[in-house]
From Swiss-Prot:
Membrane topology label: Peripheral membrane protein
Keyword set, alphabetical order: Acetylation, Coiled coil, Cytoplasm, Cytoplasmic vesicle, Exocytosis, Golgi apparatus, Lysosome, Membrane, Phosphoprotein, Synapse
GO MF terms held by the record: SNARE binding
PTM-bearing positions, type N-acetylalanine: A2
Origin species: Mus musculus (Mouse)
Protein name (record): SNARE-associated protein Snapin
Disulfide bonds: none
Cellular component GO terms, alphabetical: acrosomal vesicle; axon cytoplasm; BLOC-1 complex; BORC complex; cytoplasmic side of lysosomal membrane; cytoplasmic vesicle; cytosol; Golgi membrane
Subunit structure: Component of the biogenesis of lysosome-related organelles complex 1 (BLOC-1) composed of BLOC1S1, BLOC1S2, BLOC1S3, BLOC1S4, BLOC1S5, BLOC1S6, DTNBP1/BLOC1S7 and SNAPIN/BLOC1S8. Octamer composed of one copy each BLOC1S1, BLOC1S2, BLOC1S3, BLOC1S4, BLOC1S5, BLOC1S6, DTNBP1/BLOC1S7 and SNAPIN/BLOC1S8. The BLOC-1 complex associates with the AP-3 protein complex and membrane protein cargos. Component of the BLOC-one-related complex (BORC) which is composed of BLOC1S1, BLOC1S2, BORCS5, BORCS6, BORCS7, BORCS8, KXD1 and SNAPIN. Associates with the SNARE complex.
Lineage, broadest ranks: Eukaryota, Metazoa, Chordata, Craniata, Vertebrata
Coiled coil (residue ranges): 37-126
Entry comment describing in which tissues the protein is expressed: Strongly expressed in heart, brain, testis, kidney and liver; low expression in spleen, lung and skeletal muscle. In the testis, expressed in the seminiferous tubules.
Length: 136
């Protein structure tokens, strides 16, 4: 009798398709994590959109402060506040870039997992594992 977690072998010595314990566990884990990954991805997308909006608002406010500063007859020094706004904008852009990179890595990982899952399903459906397959 074949050990648990290994593929069965036909009388001709060729491996017969059958989900191994490892494959079943991997598939279950993927299905379990998929909603969380999708939710995380949608939240990251929403945060990125709000950061773009925040960056635009900071730009508008900085422009308006510069305009007010130029139009004032009284010497009102708004430059430190404009600099603080621009520094905040720079930080928002930095965080947005970090989020964008993380989201792209997550997207590539998700694509890679989906591709591997499809490959394994195709192997299971075909009924034969290639020689030297780690799923044997």
């Amino acid at each position: 009798m074949a050990a648990a977690g290994s593929a069965a072998v036909s009388g001709a010595g060729t491996p017969v398709a059958g989900p191994t314990g490892r494959d079943l566990f991997a598939e279950g884990l993927l299905e379990f994590l998929r909603p969380a990954v999708q939710q995380l991805d949608s939240h990251v997308h929403a945060v990125r959109e709000s950061q773009v909006e925040l960056r635009e608002q900071i730009d508008n406010l900085a422009t308006e402060l510069c305009r007010i500063n130029e139009d004032q007859k009284v010497a009102l020094d708004l430059d430190p506040y404009v600099k603080k706004l621009l520094n905040a904008r720079r930080r928002v852009v930095l965080v947005n870039n970090i989020l964008q990179n993380a989201q792209e890595r997550l997207r590539r990982l998700n694509h890679s997992v989906a591709k591997e899952t499809a490959r394994r399903r195709a192997m299971l459906d075909s009924g034969v594992y290639p020689p030297g397959s780690p799923s044997k």
